[in-house]
Amino acid sequence: MRGYFVSFEGPDGAGKSTVLKEVLDQIGPKLKPQYLVTREPGGSKIAEKIRDIILDPANDKMDAKTEALLYAAARSQHVEEIIRPALSEGKIVFSDRFVDSSLAYQGEGRDLGIEEVKQINDFATGKLDPDLTFFLDIAPEIGLSRIQKLRPGQEDRLEQENIAFHKKVYNGFLKVKDLYPDRFVTIDATQPIEDVVNQVIATLEKRLPEIF
């Protein structure tokens, strides 16, 4: 039996990592299948090394196409080494970001084109898509303010981009979720975290009742 693939998307500072941790703290013991938690870029030894290159603020001369290809390379390794084996074992895979982030950040934010970046990632992943995607919706100004308060002076290369870039990324996410309305669930990430977590859990119970 194939497992389930659930991704969490959103602008920087939306709280994806925190929400995912809180959700699994609450429902992890109740889940029937085993589950795996992973992230992008990264998720495997090789992919984590590529992550370091992508996000290092010292690499400020990185070309947009290079950036997109590095994300796709990390994702290809991640999928083949971690995600596909877990799904084939019937596990639930929860991923902090997946292809949709590249469509928003590189496709729209870097002006490479959503369709063009999708083609690169279709090749990298063998056209693997999540079964369910949570989009944590927050204005980029608010998200970046959260990061600056949480990690002052420690922003990564993409977090350090100007607000115009982050607004384009946000608009990219809006376009992407409209392309895949069947799997996207939008949640207001400006709510208290308990409310966000409860809405995620309620959606999982409704959309994937067989995992409980």
Swiss-Prot record:
Family: Belongs to the thymidylate kinase family.
Record InterPro entries: P-loop_NTPase, Thymidylate_kin-like_dom, Thymidylate_kinase
Organism listed in the record: Lactobacillus helveticus (strain DPC 4571)
Pfam family, one: Thymidylate_kin
GO (cellular component) term, any one: cytosol
Gene3D superfamilies assigned to the protein according to its UniProt record, in alphabetical order: P-loop containing nucleotide triphosphate hydrolases
Name listed for the protein in its UniProt record: Thymidylate kinase
UniProtKB keywords: ATP-binding, Kinase, Nucleotide biosynthesis, Nucleotide-binding, Transferase
Functional description taken from the UniProt entry: Phosphorylation of dTMP to form dTDP in both de novo and salvage pathways of dTTP synthesis.
EC number: 2.7.4.9
Example GO biological process: dUDP biosynthetic process
